[in-house]
Amino acid sequence: MLIGLLQDDATRSYAMLGKAVGLSSGAAHERVRKLRERGVIRRTTIDVDQEALGRAVTAYVLVDGNTWMGDSGDRLAAIPEVEEAHVIAGPASVLLKVRTSGPKELQDLLRQVFQVDGVTGTQTVVVLQTLFERTLK
């Protein structure tokens, strides 16, 4: 329950968290500290409106490679528009979630992906509309 409350609004005070789950603020603070210590809570972040920042195009890029692409994480992470990168089982080696300001910038990003050692091809799926995004609780 604490995790769900923090996912909804990580700025809530320990007093508010404690009240919501029937604990004192000190006990809520201690539980959150333990969750961080155990690695359950890895970081505290914000939810940014990407369109407001000029990143209106969201796409998923399937990356094919002729080597183990799991070793390419640092190179892919160096491309600022790459939001997520996952080694996958299926029709490609890696799945990227990317955000760019437009089609030209998406094409520029794909050129950068092709410069990563071992990349032999890509398939890109452009998002037309996001129905919802959520973090599972």
Model feature map: region roles:
Residues 1-137:
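A compositional/biophysical signature of low hydrophobicity enriched in polar/charged and small residues
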